[in-house]
Amino acid sequence: NKIYDRTGRQVMLTGVNCASLEWLSNPEKLVTTVNYALDEWHANIIRLPLSQDRWFGFGGDQQGTDESGDRYRAIVNEIITNVAKRKKYLIIDLHRSNCGSWGEFISGNMPDMNSLVFWKDIACRYGNHPNVLFGIFNEPFKVSWDCWRDGGEVTVEYAPQNIGNQIMRDESGEPVLEKITYYAPGLQKMVDTVRAVGAKNIAIVAGLDWGYELDGVDRGYTINDRGGNGIMLDSHE
């Protein structure tokens, strides 16, 4: 249960989560913020949350400006380059899925089939990069351990928003919820997709209950690494 670099030296990772690319396509000062965390706070790892929609140019703020996703991916690449130059590490975190519909912007409680497309592309670009770890999916929730590992049909509730981005509410003040059902491939399939292109990067898998519970692992719900450099379990407080 330890991490080693390519020289066999044990590595202890202590760092920060640098948010914004999961909800913005061109956030201000993100690169500067990451560099500050590395240089002034002496973090040796950065967790970088991403949106699979924005990775491919489906963000609302990308229409007419970055519909290919090139600029978005360039920001990510610049950050990875800066981290690697300092001989530190970065987690590519799939933070926002889209319930199987590009541009839907309803983040699912599990990855979806489009998440496989995202990870195949990431693995082709950053497979076996010595400074990059793969955070397979941010926080699974409201599914069984069977679905978590092996996949299945899932339903997520979400609150539609009106103009001004205020959550719509009924006369009693309760949020108006809608439901969407989609197929989740399961975390084993996600790891398999990464390994299928030859990427052996450490794969990080979060537990259930918003990435908190890991008791299912003790009951046999483990992820097969398929010859990679290891599976890291992730628990969020």
Question: Where are each of the predicted segments found?
Answer:
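Extracellular glycoside hydrolase catalytic/binding regions
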Residues: 20, 112-133, 137-237
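Residue-level recognition of alpha-helix initiation/capping sites
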Residues: 28-29, 74, 117, 185
